Amino acid sequence: MPGVTSQSAGSKYDAIPGPLGLASASLMGKVALVTGAGRGIGREMAMELGRRGAKVIVNYANSAETAEEVVQAIKKSGSDAASIKANVSDVDQIVKMFGEAKQIWGRLDIVCSNSGVVSFGHVKDVTPEEFDRVFAINTRGQFFVAREAYKHLEVGGRLILMGSITGQAKGVPKHAVYSGSKGTIETFVRCMAIDFGDKKITVNAVAPGGIKTDMYRDVCREYIPNGGELDDEGVDEFAAGWSPMHRVGLPIDIARVVCFLASQDGEWINGKVLGIDGAACM
């Protein structure tokens, strides 16, 4: 029977948490905050969370117009949404964002840390300024988003960080700074899963690979030998060949996994980094 409450096996340590038989896709009654949600993967995360019933706070750093488009689309899908401007490279802005987010609906159940920047360059050419730019958002920013998430999430909440398959791959030329900034997230996840345990909050990360966003073709050319010589169709064909499924990943592929981790079904997944690349990096 849907909604049946689980029965304890006799100890508080072996009771199945939550009701049984609920629609696994549902996030009704939850409130989510997604950073960098005005475009790309973050946009689709916010949209899919809304489609599954969550109220969504759309964070953006620059374009209020694109963030408002996401807000309106979520409302059109039948849920509710609001937007907050904050640059996650600035810790003061992160703190302010969480304070404002908590005031909107009085609670916070899910935090998706998505904001990030990409960078390419041979080690010999990397400047301190470029190193700091990338790590300020991809690594330091995610750390302090996580810190504030711990303070503001409800007991039993979910924190989902953004890694990259390049943090797991054997090595990508001219990509040390970006890959390093994402590889660090994997260590954060393992340690934070322990620290967050006293509030029953799970901490996981997704590590996408080859996702077709608005920046996809330009970025893909950097991964492809002589990629600058390929037209758009050639880029698509080459990138599709990375996966035995012979297609590229889409933002919805990431969003669905994020929603699973945010749901009741994902409760016993903790301290893990899930590679989402169609087996491109086996």
From Swiss-Prot:
The keyword Oxidoreductase applies. Its EC number is 1.1.1.-. This is Trihydroxynaphthalene reductase. It is an enzyme of class 1 (oxidoreductase). Pathway: Pigment biosynthesis; melanin biosynthesis. Homotetramer. Coiled coil: none annotated. InterPro entries: NAD(P)-bd_dom_sf, SDR_fam. GO terms for molecular function: oxidoreductase activity. Catalyzes the NADPH-dependent reduction of 1,3,8-trihydroxynaphthalene (T3HN) into (-)-vermelone. Essential for appressorial penetration of colletotrichum lagenarium. It comes from the Eukaryota. Keywords: Melanin biosynthesis, NADP, Oxidoreductase. The keyword Transit peptide does not apply. NADP(+) binds at residues 41, 114, 147, 178, 182, 211, 213. Belongs to the short-chain dehydrogenases/reductases (SDR) family. The active site is at 164 (proton donor), 178 (proton donor), 182 (lowers pka of active site tyr). One of its GO terms (biological process) is melanin biosynthetic process. Pfam families: adh_short_C2.
